[in-house]
Amino acid sequence: MILEKFDDIYQRAAEQKGGEARLQALLCEVKSTQQLLDVPDHRWLAELTRKIFQSGFVWRIVNQKWDSFEQVFWGFEIEKLLMMPDELWEKKAQDPSIIRNWSKVATIKQNAQMIYQANLEGGFSRLLAEWDSGNITALWQYLKRNGKRLGGNTGAYTLRAVGKDTFLLTHDVEAYLRNHKLIDGGIQTQRSFTIAQQVFAEWQQQSGRPLSHISQIVTFSMG
């Protein structure tokens, strides 16, 4: 597998964004393991839910309504939500202050159950915080397998938003990998995951940068 040097990608991205200083200012926060351990369970559930509602919808509208989501679902407190009877879930799903989509609202309870179960086995925040980013695609698959509507990029976007170091298979990143003949099958296949993980690991070794920043820089290099 022949890869473009990451320095070349970085320089192209810097040119696209008007210089290194502007490029650096665009890079997201990557939290330390300890900082991720300190993230409360209700914040993980809130961000999972936000990303589920943003999927296939206008992100701006979800963000505008988010304070209402927080209020309607009690700040996404896990145990409170798991004790809520079905008829109250149905009532909350029809609240006009949120986006009324029953299939997405239903994921809140299901993903709360995933977090609760992980806490019985050592802790959800600990699981995610200590997961080796060198095998980050396996964490995406864990979320898809154990949660609800967390396939595609939804789980990965959640991790990025909270601060876990992860690359994203965005349209631009996928286009880069295809243009350079690094992948040729479906982007969500195990083979593509393995190749992408290897590519990003090599760039990380070259640059010493977090996967999140490498992923963003590849995106910015595409124009």
Model-derived segments and their meaning:
Residues 1-101, 105, 217-223:
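N-terminal polyanion-binding entry modules of DNA glycosylases/AP lyases
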Residues 1-30, 124, 128-223:
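C-terminal accessory module of base-excision DNA glycosylases/AP lyases that mediates lesion recognition
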Residues 51-55, 76, 95-96, 115, ...:
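Alpha-helix C-capping/helix-to-loop hinge sites
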Residues 74-149:
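Alpha-helical ds-nucleic-acid-binding substructure associated with the helix-hairpin-helix region
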Residues 42-46, 67, 102-109, 137, ...:
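Non-catalytic, well-ordered alpha-helical scaffold segments
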